[in-house]
Amino acid sequence: MLEEDMEVAIKMVVVGNGAVGKSSMIQRYCKGIFTKDYKKTIGVDFLERQIQVNDEDVRLMLWDTAGQEEFDAITKAYYRGAQACVLVFSTTDRESFEAVSSWREKVVAEVGDIPTVLVQNKIDLLDDSCIKNEEAEALAKRLKLRFYRTSVKEDLNVNEVFKYLAEKYLQKLKQQIAEDPELTHSSSNKIGVFNTSGGSHSGQNSGTLNGGDVINLRPNKQRTKKNRNPFSSCSIP
């Protein structure tokens, strides 16, 4: 475990073509709501949720990035400092599936190889699917990514996506702290680890934690109860 007065915060970016359900996904996860009306994200939206993972307090900061090319310059700036990524395509949108590799390259170009999952959303619309199951599975295998099929509308496997990424990042963080204990004792707190024993702090990314931008945050020391998702995972290792 990390030290008692330390809080973990993870910046996750959710990327993919427009209209694949990125905004709906983080709305569902953070607020428990689903809105079927599509509104194009202009630039970047942000939501957060605090959870517990293996008895550790973890704050997830979810950045929903626009899927249109005209916002590329804006959204790329928000990739910086990301520690995990959700790559999303839609069951009913062939173009979004074919664009996955391009989105992956954009993220890697900005932040390197961070914990990432591939998500096929809208599986409640399988009757209208434009992608064969074996195609999606082959893409996940080629990119060497964990693969989830989700339905934001039915709240299927949404929690599992973010829980998996949080667990993967915690593993990485603990390994880094084991190699360099000073990560938890530096005078400037980092996105990734916060000292919550004082007042409000600023979170600054370190080179080892992918970034160099500063984001002001107010750590929350309240512990949350573990959430149980009634759906079983349909992920592919």
From Swiss-Prot:
Belongs to the small GTPase superfamily. Rab family. GO terms for biological process: autophagosome assembly; cellular defense response; cilium assembly; craniofacial suture morphogenesis; GTP metabolic process; intracellular protein transport; negative regulation of protein import into nucleus. A motif (Switch 1) lies at residues 28-46. A lipid is attached at residue 234 (S-geranylgeranyl cysteine). Mg(2+) binds at residues 23, 41, 64. One of its GO terms (cellular component) is phagocytic vesicle membrane. PROSITE patterns: RAB. It comes from the Eukaryota. The gene is RAB23. It is linked to Carpenter syndrome 1: A rare autosomal recessive disorder characterized by acrocephaly with variable synostosis of the sagittal, lambdoid, and coronal sutures; peculiar facies; brachydactyly of the hands with syndactyly; preaxial polydactyly and syndactyly of the feet; congenital heart defects; growth retardation; intellectual disability; hypogenitalism; and obesity. In addition, cerebral malformations, oral and dental abnormalities, coxa valga, genu valgum, hydronephrosis, precocious puberty, and hearing loss may be observed. It is a lipid-anchor. CDD domains: Rab23_like (cd04106). Interacts with SUFU. This is Ras-related protein Rab-23.
